[in-house]
Each structure stands twice: as C-alpha cells, then as structure tokens.
C-alpha cells in the first residue's frame, strides 16, 4: 500500500555544498549522511515536515546519477513513495504492466527500495521505499 511521499531526491555535484546551502538559506540540517557503495553515491537526508529532501552525489563516473548529471545537470532526480512492502508493490506493479528497474527490493538510504522505470510513470523515476 502506498502511504505518502517519502522524499524528493536531487542530484548534486558536491554534497557538502548542497548541505551548506540548505543550512545557510533554510536553517535545515541533514538527519543522515551515508555512502552507499553498491549504488555509487553519497547521500544526505534533510527532513522537512513529514517528508525529506535527499541530496545524492555520485562517487563513481559509471553510475546512473553521474550519467544524469552529465546529461541534465543538477536537479530533481527521483521521487520516492513510502510503501508497506517494497517487494509486494514491485510485483503488483509488474503484474499491471509497469516496467521496473528493480524486480526485488534492495537496501538504500530510505530503507528497502526499488525503482520503477520512468517510461511507466510519464518520465518520472519513481522509488518505492519501505522503512525497515
């Protein structure tokens, strides 16, 4: 079941600068900063009300985020929706004909995550996130 928007992810070239900007301009501080080697990113979550902004910086040039920055520059990368069960939701969406990037959930900064291909959601990269 879909619960709420969990976070909006913004691809950045320099995570420290992005964090500093939000601290200076909005007095917002990250609740979590983590390197996620299997995804090739370093990320920070900044709480805003009951949702978060996630800054993601590539740590390798061969990642999807690095390619995104190369082609589109900094900006919104994906929207994450909180779900009760990532695997069940991915299966349900696939049965309805959605094209998936992940067939099963995997570990991510927002919990157990899985991505739906933008071709299935009108150009939006959609992340499903289950709190664990």
Language-model segments: which ranges?
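N-terminal beta-strand motif that seeds the catalytic metal site of vicinal oxygen chelate
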Residues: 1-17, 74-83, 132
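Vicinal oxygen chelate
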Residues: 44-47, 54, 81, 90-132
């Amino acid at each position: 079941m879909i619960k709420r928007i969990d976070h909006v992810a913004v691809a950045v070239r320099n995570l420290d600068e992005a964090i500093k900007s939000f601290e200076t301009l909005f007095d917002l501080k990250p609740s979590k900063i983590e390197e996620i080697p299997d995804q090739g990113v370093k990320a920070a979550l900044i709480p805003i009300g009951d949702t978060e902004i996630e800054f993601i910086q590539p740590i390798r040039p061969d990642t999807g985020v690095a390619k995104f920055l190369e082609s589109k520059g900094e900006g919104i990368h994906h929207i994450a929706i909180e779900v009760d069960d990532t695997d069940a939701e991915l299966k349900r969406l696939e049965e309805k004909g959605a094209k998936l990037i992940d067939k099963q959930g995997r570990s991510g900064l927002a919990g157990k995550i899985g991505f739906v291909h933008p071709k299935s959601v009108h150009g939006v990269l959609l992340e499903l996130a289950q709190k664990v």
